[in-house]
Amino acid sequence: MKNQVSIRLNSTLGLLSMLMFGSVSAQSDTANWPSQNLNIENSRYSTLDQIDTSNVDQLTMLWSFEPGLRDDIAQVTPLVVDGVMYLHSRATMYALDATTGEELWRRSLDSGPANGPVRGSTYAEGRVYAYRGADLYAFDAATGAALASFGDSGFLKVVAQGLHHQYPDTYPTDIDPITI
């Protein structure tokens, strides 16, 4: 199982690295992939055109990355923003140089149990957001430092806070949200 995950990850990372950085200087503004499905519209489409049916058989792996036994990232869509690849596992957030595969930073996501697959993280305005279980993390994309201004020093218990939220007594419970 670990070998299958490793092979899939290596293949995906190698292909993504070539797709994103093979020769994108003319299209550098479209080389970023900041969220799981590219953008808020979930378009899943890149305008990069360096790889097509005429040259796909010439691809070779440039580098690979082994996250470790504890970090299952088999179903993660890596993000690529400004030459940095971000990978979010069940237990760790990684930042890698997308051209070389060199690890730039890693941060633990250690707030409790994390069941089920991890689908990926999101990048916005110099921040990387990742989740584990019912908790959300925010990191500075350049340094990996937890963002002190987000939640409890970079960590937010989303479900716990949502379940304990008290609406004011004057909240109109009989109004349809669309009419508000």
Where are these regions (language model features)?
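N-terminal secretory signal peptides that target proteins for export/translocation
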Residues: M1-R8
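Bacterial N-terminal signal peptides
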Residues: N10-S23
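Aromatic (tryptophan-biased) beta-strands that constitute blades/sheets of beta-rich domains
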Residues: Q27-L69, E102-S111, A145-P168
